[in-house]
């Protein structure tokens, strides 16, 4: 950059960029450095605010190529006489004259000439953040002009100035704004003086450099605390006390430090960034990276003053890049080292193969025939006991390959058999080596590992899905290390070499799972039982409260240990550790025990599986208070059920299933359905107990519940048993397929059509998938094809499992359905879901030929039985809604929908003509109406009733509209519902017209379209005002009942203009009623309606003109007919009169529930006490009592 004619106050952006590019050759910086240039100085302005280029690449020296900035400025002023304020502000900010710029900003604000540059700078808190590290030289020399300033409250003052200036509150007077601005300006000036005082105090409190060096020379001596540090620590300590509820201690602490404001961090000092709280500082004390200065070798005795000037100003990003590069280089070196090891192993193995081949030939010629036969027998084994694969690649038992042993390639077998003789030969030649005892011990233990295989017939897919619930993980680097166990001391050394680099930097940071491979290897190979027990104790107590990932690592290690040492040592060494932790105070440790029981189940002796482990889990399920522990217990019990083969344990398994289903935690019940029940059902299938014991036991318990529930059914237990039956449906269907007559003809062929996606309901877990139970999706496709063909063409002769379902199971469950309470929507819904899943699982052919005929035989919907009410009693039971919603809705084709419509029409007709209760039809409409897909279908059924010739059927259709309106969208209400109701409201039969009133009321309650509301309002008005209805007692009863039900939730205008005036008229007319029975009926309904409406907002005019007069008329009736009601009415009238007299209180409390005073004096006192707590203004108080819409 040319220095002679530079005007620092008049340089364009483009010129600035060009000059920066020219100067960039001297001090080249990376993009990351430029991005963080912001942090070089605590007050350096943001990049967008620089009007000119930096005068030098060194930001701390305001000179241009050796020419001082002042000279450049003078030459610029001489060349251009007028300088803009913005350029002056930019120069002040660039030279770090922050206080001067602050005073200029204040002066300009007072003059009304605010600079956007200064406003943006001083309103940005990021410009006032302190650097993380301050060079010692700066500390010793004091704070210079560009040094950091102690932050005070002036920033908020400037922000408030800006807020006041741009306030849009037009109601304030100009003098008020002037007063506010003067106050803020005065506050800003006081803050400026306080800043200067803080700077002076900070400079005076600095310790002399010689004294500081004396402290540094003695490591035992600590520097005296500085005032700034004391204030910061005081603030953090007080904050900790408040967060942890030590309020009295905090108050005492604040009193003892009355010179400090603990409410505001800025009181500690200007430009001091707030550190984390004490707890975070304590947790991070071991994680903090040492400062760059601390890395200087002490032996060299480097003094900070001797370091280069830019030593402490290097960007943190450069340090990070260096660290990352070093780490990457270490990784590359480690990989190269491993590659070299593998190459050397490859060469050595090739030489060994050649040597072995020659040795084998020599042995065959020279040794005896007995030894030769022994070697051949060893070679002939598919899985040799003394094989010795390559040191680092094959000396491990990998739990990830346990389920894939059948898929080993011929190449692997060949290479394994090739190395057998070498291993045996080496064993004979290494007997004199120092560690031969350890090696022989390891090989002996490996060769003797055999596990008890249960006598079970689970499909591989089901077995693998069951084991997936054992929470093990070998996907990560550490998981792969844990899942492999070394066989010899040489492999241990290799593992130590891999694991120690990860352990050393992490063990102090709660990364203790890195120790698991070392602990397991040592525990496997150590010859002393006490030491092994101690190591396993350390493993289970390694982490105080292990999280999910840490528990998975420990479990993976336990499984690898079990695979290596065998069932005897697992029982003797691992199980005692689990037993010790079973009552641990931390739930995470108990959770580890519960998960370990399931993970170790395949590697335990079968006697232990079915006795000790089962008892441990049963105790934890019954006693543990943590939901997550019981959930893990249930999953482990499911795994145990996949391995248990003792038939005597069936009853214990059944009790465990009931105990799990009755657990109060939803997550435990969910785990029971997902894991335990499918596994238990698979065992019952092998025992032959699924159809003979398990399902009949659940049905018996349901029947017992129904017998005991005459005075109240335990719906929770009914749901528990029925949900268990529902979870058993896939297993039951799998039994049918596996025991079918066509099983001998099953062949996997390519021409079998694939299974439709919607063929089966979505399973709750993989264990409930029929394909998993059977073995594979291809095999299931073949079985389904033969199953449908058998049902459709060949019949069920000899198919015992299917005949049991058709002849025993279905009749019993249908009989149970007929005995449940139809008014219980929960029971109806549960049984509907059960039949829906049953029919979807067993298929459409089974549903049409086996399920529907049994329901149709029971319901008997023929016209001949219309008058025989005794024969149609079943139509009033829950059988109707469950058949309609659980069976007829399984398949959604056109013929299925027609069948459903016809059934509902027949039920509606039969019930209406038989004068039977409509509860079963209502339950059907409620259950189907919850699904919008059936709204059109239900409307079709109701229209059939609207146009029916019988008035009874039309009455039923009118009442069904009330149930349907709430769930139907307003378009259907306008197009289908309202026209049908209008048609019925003009019916010749008065009973049909009366039946439409509840539906009209529900429309007024739920619909928002004004046109619809007006049509309904006109129809209701015709009922009330038409002379032909004046003596219709039933109509008046229905209208009053409807008003009381929908009035509180209806549109306010409808309530005020229609409901309250007509209730007043009805009450007045009831005073002239001569028939006492009718009068008491109307009066009772009016009392209920007025009690419901008293909780609504009622204006003073309505209160005087309609509400109070109606109450007085009603009181007149109650004085003669019901004195106890008259007392309540008198209290209501008195309170309303008080409200009318006191208008102010009436406006504030217009929506107070009048009925609150009727509940009792206690409720009234509580309500008034709440009112007394309100300290808001009248406008806000009015919002509390909003009009209810």
From Swiss-Prot:
May regulate intracellular cholesterol transport. Gene3D superfamilies: Leucine-rich Repeat Variant. SMART domains: LisH. GO terms for biological process: intracellular cholesterol transport. The keyword Repeat applies. The keyword DNA-binding does not apply. InterPro entries: ARM-like, ARM-type_fold, HEAT_type_2, LisH, RELCH. HEAT repeats lie at residues 574-612, 613-652, 977-1015. Residues 229-261 form the LisH domain. Residues 172-205, 326-373 form a coiled coil. Disulfide bonds: none annotated. This is RAB11-binding protein RELCH homolog. It is found in: Recycling endosome; Golgi apparatus, trans-Golgi network. Residues 404-425 have a biased composition (Low complexity).
